[in-house]
């Protein structure tokens, strides 16, 4: 059962009271930061240690700084809590143990909108061999259970001889058709695995996903995205 605890203006969510207490440690800054993997306007990701146990800590910042996304958090759980709930359900109900397990979500709201969120998940101690074919197979497995990744690039997968782990996903369910499945696979094929043998039948959803991918790669669209990125780095909230 999902637990919720209020603490110093924050809402802590976990499936075990142990991680509620870990959340209090994080809010009180009672942890050691071992490595910072990413620190941008969009995300903060680091390895932290509490009571000699290491975790991956992530702050998804986009929903707090981009006005339209922040507004819609009035009606949504937010990325941290969604990740906690969805991934744990996928692991327990569909036996998708390849997902890196999240333990805790921290959410703070102001005027009903999220102004801060974070979550922690297990630290994966595997040296990846970056096996692209294994990544395709595990992606097909989550698609067969009705889930999609949403950011299907090799850095979000850890592969080894005996184990595969999936990172950085909210484990959302696909809607009507398999558009999201095609989009996941096309992302990898176009960006990092051009020689891939395409694993799905090319139906109407394939061509829709392909059209969207090609549109996003148009030069003027990429220039707009790059301009927005630079403005965000300067503090613009767009």
Show the residue positions of the predicted features.
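Protein kinase catalytic-loop region centered on the HRD/HxD motif
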Residues: 141-147
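Hydrophobic residue at the +6 position relative to the catalytic HRD Asp in the kinase catalytic loop
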Residues: 155-159
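Active-site ExK catalytic segment of metal-dependent nucleases
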Residues: 56-63, 122-124, 168-170
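Juxta-kinase regulatory segment immediately upstream of eukaryotic protein kinase catalytic domains
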Residues: 1-35, 227-237
